[in-house]
UniProtKB/Swiss-Prot annotation:
Mode of membrane association: Peripheral membrane protein
Protein name: NADH-quinone oxidoreductase subunit C/D
Main location per the UniProt record: membrane
Keywords noted in UniProt: Cell inner membrane, Cell membrane, Membrane, Multifunctional enzyme, NAD, Quinone, Translocase, Transport, Ubiquinone
Subcellular location: Cell inner membrane
PANTHER family: NADH-QUINONE OXIDOREDUCTASE SUBUNIT C_D (PTHR11993:SF45), NADH-UBIQUINONE OXIDOREDUCTASE 49 KDA SUBUNIT (PTHR11993)
Signal peptide boundaries: none
Role of this protein: NDH-1 shuttles electrons from NADH, via FMN and iron-sulfur (Fe-S) centers, to quinones in the respiratory chain. The immediate electron acceptor for the enzyme in this species is believed to be ubiquinone. Couples the redox reaction to proton translocation (for every two electrons transferred, four hydrogen ions are translocated across the cytoplasmic membrane), and thus conserves the redox energy in a proton gradient.
GO molecular-function terms, A-Z: NAD binding; NADH dehydrogenase (ubiquinone) activity; NADH:ubiquinone reductase (non-electrogenic) activity; quinone binding
Family: In the N-terminal section; belongs to the complex I 30 kDa subunit family. In the C-terminal section; belongs to the complex I 49 kDa subunit family.
Superkingdom assignment: Bacteria
Subunit structure: NDH-1 is composed of 13 different subunits. Subunits NuoB, CD, E, F, and G constitute the peripheral sector of the complex.
The reaction(s) this protein catalyses: a quinone + NADH + 5 H(+)(in) = a quinol + NAD(+) + 4 H(+)(out)
Amino acid sequence: MVNNMTDLTAQEPAWQTRDHLDDPVIGELRNRFGPDAFTVQATRTGVPVVWIKREQLLEVGDFLKKLPKPYVMLFDLHGMDERLRTHREGLPAADFSVFYHLISIDRNRDIMLKVALAENDLHVPTFTKLFPNANWYERETWDLFGITFDGHPNLRRIMMPQTWKGHPLRKDYPARATEFSPFELTKAKQDLEMEALTFKPEEWGMKRGTENEDFMFLNLGPNHPSAHGAFRIVLQLDGEEIVDCVPDIGYHHRGAEKMGERQSWHSYIPYTDRIEYLGGCVNEMPYVLAVEKLAGITVPDRVNVIRVMLSELFRINSHLLYISTFIQDVGAMTPVFFAFTDRQKIYDLVEAITGFRMHPAWFRIGGVAHDLPRGWDRLLREFLDWMPKRLASYEKAALQNTILKGRSQGVAAYGAKEALEWGTTGAGLRATGIDFDVRKARPYSGYENFDFEIPVGGGVSDCYTRVMLKVEELRQSLRILEQCLNNMPEGPFKADHPLTTPPPKERTLQHIETLITHFLQVSWGPVMPANESFQMIEATKGINSYYLTSDGSTISYRTRIRTPSYAHLQQIPAAIRGSLVSDLIVYLGSIDFVMSDVDR
């Protein structure tokens, strides 16, 4: 069991600005590189943020990876356009910056490294030599910011089409369609686009056949039922055996992070539901918690429990779809229809509480949209009485089936080392024997007050183990819901804080000052203090996080969304090489991903 991250900060509110100079890793870095080798930034991220020189990057990364309790996972990597940022007191001069978020499982601690870059020299050495999963993150950072990673094995666009001009997350790049010239698809442009789609193996890092060997190249997707969305995998086959494969993503990209720079802190909430469109309120949780850190808001206990309750309902809802579609991918049709019957009961309950079903957009900065309705407890009790028996029937009728076991046991198997190298989280990581669930390791929204267990595998993560862990996670979510039902606190559903949005009625319409405040907050949105905040949660598919940068405005200066599905799809080639195409179908079904979560 990992140590609880809250030990060092148990007496401090989550939103306190800290430089984390007391974190042991800061001392280790200073002992190795000298006390003046870098700048420590005070933030509300909850992790040490260290600015280092570009020339030090690989040496510092290697040092952190080889510490006695090493930082073994590259959790996230991306960039920021710093040119319009006004609140940068005490930070190195930078037109752009790149950040590297590393996690140590043994310490249950993080560190964020930052590198400052000048606009006329947007080069930084590739991190893929230390962490293979840096590949996609560096491609995306180049695609959206134009930052070059020297030595990268295949630095090409990943979100945008190969013919795209410009880098969309730069501040001088238009954010609205009305800022572009009208689009016209001329014959010449159409021919250019078609030419760009011509498949050339060497552009994908694959080798062509020779006189002595020949391969078949096969497209799986982007329209294939087992691809679970607009997702393409280019397969290099020797007969039925997968010699190599390259996932091709970006078909579902909607510019969610760019939208965060146009919407107010409050009006961005509905967008979070649609990042991973099966998770509902689960996706709202990291965003509102990160904004509340910026605002300095501590919510009432009732809000915490309500948020946990809605999150676990959506976790069950998502897991039911995952388990049933996995069974369908293996070849059994009936369970998916049973699952949709059970999911309908959850949607009815969610609708009774929030007024909406799939995308409630119900969490608010400082609380929730409204209080629980009368009768919510009866509906939840009926569901809790119904679901355990149904779950047992899924397991007995389908998941213990010998054909399903034969198709999934030992398929696409990997160990803890591989999972950490590729940034795998959620059931895929825990199946390898690593007990890391954010709800336990780094409790948020009051999860530390609930009694539940974290299912963990025996050392190897294969398709069958991943699915069975999700089944047990369903049971644990039912335990949490039972406690929500029996121990729902009394109290307000919003925090009494000036930045709670929309503000409580008692803070509005009393006299001219409250009228003005209400008008500004509702029309323009609240003004968040200039700072940075970060929040990770245990989402339905793994760890989801929001890293927010405020420049003291009504909108976010930078909204970075790290999703689990993105990391999990990058791992596909490493896990499936040498297997059969039929094994790939089972593997895809066991990952639990949706393309909106990948492409954002």
